[in-house]
Every structure is written in C-alpha cells, then in structure tokens.
Amino acid sequence: GPENKALFSEAQQNEMWQLQTIIPAASRPPYNTHFNGYGLGWFLNDVKGYKQVSHTGGLEGNVTQVTLLPELQLGIIVLTNQQEGAAFTAITNTIKDSYLGIPAQDYVTLYHNRIKANVATADKVTEEVWTTVAKNKKDKVKTDWKSIIGTYKDNWFGTIELSEKKGKIYFQSKRSPQLAGEVFFYKSGNLVVKWNNAFFNADAHLFLENDASGKTIGIKMKPISDLTDFSYDFQDLDFKRVN
C-alpha cells in the first residue's frame, strides 16, 4: 500500500517457508532438484542450487503463478487470461533459466507437444465412456433409478441430491450449487455425471455401494479424465445416504 506496511513479519515468512509436507523430488537436468515439498501456503524446492518458493492460483478463465528465488533477488509473477498452466510455466522457466545460466530452449513447443499427447490419451478414455453411455441409451438399458435417487452426505463436502426430473436423473450439490448435472448409466454399479457447466472439464464417475436389497447406501466418485483439476477432490469424497 501507499504506507509500505509489511503484510507479514520476517519471522512469519521464515515459518511459512519451512517444509511441512515432503513431495518426491525429480533430480534431473536442467534444475537438478534435491528437495521438494510444501510449506505453509508455498511450494518449496531447489533449482540448480538455489532455493525456490512458488505457488499457482486459478479461477475459471485464468491461471497465475508466483515464483521467488530469494538468493537471486528474483521474483516472477505471471497472470494469464486462459486456463492452461503450461503457459505460465513456459514464461516463468524462460525468465528463470536466463538468471540461472541455463541455455535457452523452446518451452512453448515442448509443453505444447506434451499437452497434445496427454490430451489424446485422456480423450480416448472419455470417448469410450460417453460412447458406452450413448449405446446404453440407444439399447434402452434398464436401470433401477428408484433404488438410487435420494440424499447423500459426505462429512467434508456436505450434501448432494440425486433426483428425477421429467424422466432424467440429476446430481445437485447443496453447498456447491454449480456442481449440478445429468446422471447416466455407464456400467453395473457405475454411473457418470456430466456437469451443466462444460468449462469444468471434470465429468465424473459415481460408484454405487448397495445393501443386500439393492438399494444404494453410499457413493464414491472419481474423475473420468486424468486431466481433471486435482482440486475437485472427487476421489476423497465418501457419500452416505441420509434420506
């Protein structure tokens, strides 16, 4: 601000930059990283012998990255108006490498080719799922939706409802209202949900836990695509029927 007041003290900064969670380190050129982990709100590692402090952020339509190399008195902030993390990584690494004396390389092409390959692999998986769903619909595969619809709760995420509207089944989160979409039969004990907001890129599996009578008493989730943003945390949810 105009008064140049510190947001936090040096002692608080040092505490934030202490490792709390260990993350495996990839010790390979050009950075030859020896340690990797998470502090209090910051990723911590070393690049070519220098401590690196960083974090990313994002909302729908933009992603950002902040990178600090204190020993070089270097700070890099990249703000974007798109959703591809490789963009800010390419910019950050290009600047960082110039300070570290690393020969320049074409990060844009490198990451473009890597993403293209990853997307092609992920697309095969998602296409198989939705092709199967379409075939099930065409073949009029019968599903006992009455035993599935109801209200379920995860202790962390809160309540969701599976309900029938005009012959279709819908998923609705109470706490996160945008997590809403139509539910389809995929395989025995396995439904899939297609979110109304396609920009999520996070359609998900619903795995059913049934009692002896065939009534669904629990639901677990998993993203269909391996490229789904990790922050959805579907794999950590464990819904139990409450109604």
Question: Model-predicted segments: where are they?
Answer:
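Catalytic loop of the DD-peptidase/beta-lactamase superfamily, centered on the K-T-G motif
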Residues: 1-243
